[in-house]
């Protein structure tokens, strides 16, 4: 049985000073519950984003679903476009292997 995981934001900032971690967690876990892996952080006040690119790509390739906000952040950083390119390359490679057989 495969566990459905999501990449989403969890708030760790104080009152009127938002700060978010970008984490991988089970889809059924509460928003501020336990997470599997920390993939970076986002500070909307300063507009600062720090991401672990390789870890994010690995989680996406394993089937993790990003939330809309995280997907927008990944698009702005160029990681989402890279993931789509990797996904298309894998499809083409699998198609070529199946034709070769």
UniProtKB/Swiss-Prot annotation:
Family of this protein: Belongs to the bacterial ribosomal protein bS16 family.
Organism field: Ureaplasma parvum serovar 3 (strain ATCC 700970)
Gene Ontology cellular component terms for the protein in this record: cytoplasm; small ribosomal subunit
A single GO molecular function term of this UniProt record: structural constituent of ribosome
Name of the protein this chain belongs to: Small ribosomal subunit protein bS16
Top-rank lineage group of the source organism: Bacteria
GO biological process: translation
A Pfam family of this chain: Ribosomal_S16
Ligase recorded as keyword: no
Keyword annotations of the record: Ribonucleoprotein, Ribosomal protein
Keyword Ribonucleoprotein part of the UniProt annotation: yes
